[in-house]
Amino acid sequence: MAAPLRYALTLLAWLCMLVVYAPLVPASVLLISPALSFAHWQALFADPQLPQALLATVVSTIVAAVGALFIALAIVVSLWPGDRWRSLAGRLPWLLAIPHVAFASATLLLFAEGGLLWRALPAFTPPMDSYGIGLGVTLAVKESAFVLWILTVLLSETRLSGQVIILDSLGYNRYQAMRWLILPSIAPALGVVMLAVVAWTLSAVDVAMILGPGNPPTLAVLSWQWLSQGDSDQQSKGALASLLLVMLLALFALVGYLIWRIWRRTLPSVHGLRQPHVPALSGKALSRALPLAGLLCALLLAVLARDATPDVDALINSLQIGALASVLALVMLLLWLEWGPRHRHRWVWLPILLPALPLVVGQYAVALRTGQDGQFSTLIWGHLLWVAPWMLFVLQPTWRRIDPRLILVAQTLGWSPIKIFCYLKCPLMLRPALIALAVGFSVSIAQYMPTLWLGAGRFPTLTTEAVALSSGGSTGILAAQALWQLLLPLLVFMLTAGISTWVGRARQGMR
């Protein structure tokens, strides 16, 4: 390839990523500038809603993170390695396709006062949940599927599974294997995964608006409400509340690291002391309950929807935005993987590892400054900040595993780098690209805050309509909105899986 073309493609890859990640800079400025005023801090801490909102946020986050980790590790202890683990791993993409808002809507319609459970058992009155425990439990169930999905990758090493089998054969039970072998091996990567879970839970606005607590709400919802007001003083309080979310994330990360360091020092040496094998009934029950929860969510929404139809405009907008955002992200990421840097690009994971609310504030500031708020293209640009890193998470491992000998053979045949990219690497990436498209579409469907702010309310989606209806409205229409929000990603996953199977018939390496 001629040097000018290579430089042009490298520049294009960098420009695409910088345009998408540009809001990180104004987000930092908007968070720091109010923090320099002592009066703004006084106004924030003087607000009577802050202590309860902070407490509800901390409690719901701890319940969600610890619960998701417990469910995932209990299932690993019970099923891994084995055929049942592989069977569950094959069903995880379908569970991940269920958006948080759809799952939360089903939970609301089942357990809330006036829901199905309340109608069946009138004596059952849901207790007041001012600490966000119900929110945390719901997110724990939903996020456990994500943690399990990552664990399927981390536990895919043949060496690790072989060592567990050896421990089993020597008489050590599964809990000893988990404590002495599995956790120490995967702890660094698992820590990053849990950081992403905590970051998402801290800034969950849509799910918290559906499930509560209501008054005062969680800190993310409170910050969202302040930032949405026209008063500059209230907006400063909202920015400081967003900064508090970042500080809470740092605090959770520090506490998690300290717990890991302390726990690692307590690891005993293996002196041959066996413990009796205890049936892992909880893990087996959870492995059955997790897919069942997804199935019940879909059935409940289908029953409650009855003859109600979703908003056609919201359905079309969701489909268009999700398709365009995922396709654009795929093209951009393939360019980035081929012509981007090989090292020192960890900043691309920041949207996953940081609370979403400050990033949306940065996006909105850029859109206002450029006069592009309320535009359809701006809406797609806003979704790319979260669609791109999740799709890169799917694409990057396969890209790095491409056999360099294939590239060497192509080079000896005189192929140019652009020809190698188009005729060798892209066909090899077809299957992960299809999976990435489905993941990107699902991530785009779930976006609430960027859609509402960057679209200026002009482009309703299934997510925004479901959140709006959750505060009051027709149960059937809410169920229909949430059902279609669930069905769209599921249909895309089925479509990409079918295409992958069809293409793999003619390509042995892709089966």
Model-derived regions: residue spans:
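Membrane-water interface segments at the C-terminal ends of transmembrane alpha-helices
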Residues: A2-A35, F45-S156, S185, A189-D206, ...
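Flexible interhelical linker loops that connect adjacent transmembrane helices
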Residues: I259-A289
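Helix-loop-helix hairpin linking two adjacent transmembrane segments in secondary transporters
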Residues: W226-L243, M247
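Loop-to-transmembrane helix entry/capping segments in MFS-fold secondary transporters
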Residues: R86, I166-L167, Q235-G238, L408-A410, ...
